[in-house]
């Protein structure tokens, strides 16, 4: 039996895979996500599925959307996955495939599938995955909740205009069929949205600081490029 890896080992693996410094605004985000994912994946009842993959990709991409330099976003994601013994390319492919499945065909049929209605048409083996979730023990996580809601929203957007109604119907019709607390799912979705809002505010502050620094640098460069004014030699006539 393999020993459960420790949080310190997971952190060490991450920083070994990505030794570069992470921008201060995002370092806490990455570390908190790493801890959350570690605790989820070492749970003995954790099951990897496309909904978890979609949740992880959605969470990460949403929180790290404005990270600079942009080319480092994927490098950090890859290091995060590898530290958790997950394959980043598989995660992204599973997430894309799930979004494509939910976006194809009749929206109401896809919605019926998520609601586990007996007459719902199965696509991509999703019915078996969802039915597996109904059989406890099944590790619940915020990442899984975000994945389920993201898949649901693909079809629900065309049926229900208001976000509040979409969330309410998701809790009533999808989560209620699963052995998860609807209240906990609701709070986790609220936490996710508030985290996105905080990151947007933080980005706005950082962007303003960058603009201010750039303006100050431009003023200095302009001042340095001005020709020196000669006042002449006061000891000479006409000076």
UniProtKB/Swiss-Prot annotation:
Keywords: Coiled coil
Disulphide bonds in the chain: none
Parts forming coiled coils: 183-221
One Gene Ontology CC term in the entry: plasma membrane-derived thylakoid photosystem II
Signal peptide, first to last residue: none
Compositional bias annotation for Basic and acidic residues: 211-221
HAMAP family in UniProt: Thf1 (MF_01843)
KW Coiled coil (keyword) present: yes
Organism field: Synechococcus sp. (strain JA-2-3B'a(2-13))
Taxonomic superkingdom: Bacteria
Designated name of the protein: Protein Thf1
Presence of keyword Coiled coil: yes
Family according to the record: Belongs to the THF1 family.
């Amino acid at each position: 039996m393999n020993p459960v890896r420790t949080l310190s080992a997971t952190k060490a693996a991450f920083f070994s895979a990505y030794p570069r410094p992470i921008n201060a605004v995002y370092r806490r985000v990455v570390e908190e996500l790493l801890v959350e994912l570690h605790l989820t994946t070492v749970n003995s009842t954790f099951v990897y599925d496309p909904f978890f993959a979609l949740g992880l990709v959605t969470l990460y991409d949403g929180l790290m959307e404005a990270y600079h330099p942009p080319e480092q976003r994927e490098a950090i994601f890859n290091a995060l996955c590898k530290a958790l013994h997950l394959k980043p390319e598989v995660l992204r492919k599973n997430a894309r495939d799930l979004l494509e499945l939910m976006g194809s065909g009749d929206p109401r049929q896809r919605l019926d599938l998520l609601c586990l209605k007996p007459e719902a048409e199965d696509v991509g083996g999703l019915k078996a995955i969802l039915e597996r979730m109904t059989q406890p023990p099944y590790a619940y996580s915020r990442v899984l909740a975000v994945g389920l809601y993201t898949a649901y929203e693909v079809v629900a957007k065309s049926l229900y205009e208001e976000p509040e109604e979409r969330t309410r119907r998701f809790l009533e019709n999808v989560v209620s069929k699963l052995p998860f607390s609807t209240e906990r799912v609701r709070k986790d979705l609220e936490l996710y949205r508030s985290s996105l809002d905080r990151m947007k505010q933080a980005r706005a502050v950082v962007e303003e600081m960058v603009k201010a620094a750039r303006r100050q640098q431009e003023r200095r460069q302009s001042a340095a490029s001005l020709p020196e004014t000669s006042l002449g030699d006061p000891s000479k006539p006409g000076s």
